[in-house]
């Protein structure tokens, strides 16, 4: 039995407004926006299943939320470097607009810089939060799988092979597939 539960959470945005003095002695405000995952522990809704008289605990195979958070953490140094390069480039554009457009150009460039700074919050939103597995040996024939708060799943185990029961549980959505391997 393989079960997907929940969805990977979406990324949030952390914005830091930094007052920095330029080489000319002027104070400027710069924005730094980074994607973050808020600390939300995932609690699976299904922890065990029953087949006949057997109760089988589900063992987590992978927690994709943890993989997503680890990937984001590993990408942070490169993201910070890119953000610093963007700030330098935006400051160059602002300085040129201030030179050519005076105070109006300077104000417009600063407003654009503050408004345009957004973190890349694209996420793994369509992936399950956790994938778990349960294994057991059954005799050939008809069996019933029971889950809390779900309809029973009737399936047949053939004499020659394996039977995979693939379950998806996301919020109020539930689906099952039985595959003879």
Regions found by a protein language model. Give the residues of each.
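Short loop/turn and low-complexity linker motifs enriched in small/turn-promoting residues
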Residues: 1-181
């Amino acid at each position: 039995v393989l079960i997907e539960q929940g969805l990977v959470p979406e990324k949030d945005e952390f914005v830091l407004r930094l007052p920095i003095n330029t080489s000319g002695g002027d104070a400027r405000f710069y924005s730094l926006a980074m994607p973050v995952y808020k600390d939300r522990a995932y609690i699976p809704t299904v922890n065990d299943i029953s087949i006949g008289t057997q109760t089988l605990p589900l063992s987590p195979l992978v927690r994709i939320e943890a993989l997503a958070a680890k990937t984001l953490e590993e990408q942070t140094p490169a993201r910070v470097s890119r953000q610093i390069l963007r700030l330098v480039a935006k400051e160059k554009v602002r300085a040129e607009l201030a030179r050519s457009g005076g105070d109006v150009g300077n104000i417009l460039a600063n407003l654009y810089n503050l408004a345009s700074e957004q973190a890349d919050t694209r996420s793994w939103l369509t992936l399950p939060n956790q994938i778990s597995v349960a294994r057991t040996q059954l005799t050939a024939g008809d069996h019933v799988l029971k889950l809390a708060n779900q309809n029973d799943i009737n399936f047949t185990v053939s004499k020659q092979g394996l039977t995979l029961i693939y379950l998806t549980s996301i919020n109020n959505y539930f689906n099952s597939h039985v595959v003879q391997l």
